[in-house]
């Protein structure tokens, strides 16, 4: 005989069902990548499709799933629909999920070494060390992400230097300081590639593993172009 659940029990199970809506929306590698990209800046569907190397149709479907779970929001700008994270806590959720995976799954480090095969070639520096170095003007901070992501928010004092611009703009960088590169975070190779190029030009280079999401989670503020006006 099936026992009838009390109203209290039904409400409790309903709560867990609602919590599971969030985990279900995140239980897809493509949607996790979209979250990671939206931490950097708001993007259109076409932009996200290009960055994630997916079709526009598939990207749109994944975004709709995230939207139903209220993890992303969208608004129309001209002819485009622009997506962004619904709450800063979502960035923190992704960062902590990634850290749990790194702690619990030995395969993460193995695959990370295959993906970022230069990641052990440069000295690591923490967000706290970067913040301290900026206060006494000891480091030159290079943002290796695309310029639109830099404009959406970057580490204080950082210079926008996308990897594909380094060769033609290297003369803009002063010598005499330690260069620190960063990009979207640990699951991104842009800062590694920038470090290789800058090192070849004779600059002492360190790599910040954190991106803008981790920087904010550490308690530090971002800077935007309008902040300097």
Role assignments for model-derived ranges:
Residues 1-18, 92-137, 143, 225:
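Amphipathic alpha-helical dimerization/coiled-coil segments
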């Amino acid at each position: 005989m099936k026992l009838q659940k009390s109203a209290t029990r039904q409400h409790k199970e309903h709560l867990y069902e609602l919590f599971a809506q969030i985990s279900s929306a995140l239980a897809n590698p493509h949607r996790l990548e979209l979250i990671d990209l939206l931490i950097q800046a708001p993007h259109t569907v076409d932009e996200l499709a290009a960055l994630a190397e997916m079709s526009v149709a598939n990207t749109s479907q994944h975004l709709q799933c995230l939207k139903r779970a209220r993890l992303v929001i969208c608004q129309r700008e001209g002819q485009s629909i622009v997506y962004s994270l619904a709450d800063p806590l979502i960035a923190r959720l992704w960062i902590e999920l990634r850290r749990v995976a790194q702690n619990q799954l030995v395969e993460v480090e193995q695959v990370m070494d295959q993906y970022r095969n230069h990641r052990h070639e440069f000295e690591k520096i923490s967000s706290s060390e970067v913040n301290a170095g900026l206060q006494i003007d000891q480091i030159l901070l290079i943002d290796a992400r695309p310029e639109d992501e830099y404009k959406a928010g970057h580490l204080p004092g950082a210079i926008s230097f996308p990897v594909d611009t380094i060769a033609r703009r290297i003369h803009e960088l002063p010598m005499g300081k330690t260069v620190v590169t960063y990009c979207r975070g640990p699951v991104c190779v842009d800062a590694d590639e920038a470090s290789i190029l800058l090192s070849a030009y004779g600059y002492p280079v360190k790599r910040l593993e954190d991106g803008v999401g981790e920087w904010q989670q550490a308690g530090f503020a971002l800077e935007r172009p309008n902040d300097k006006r």
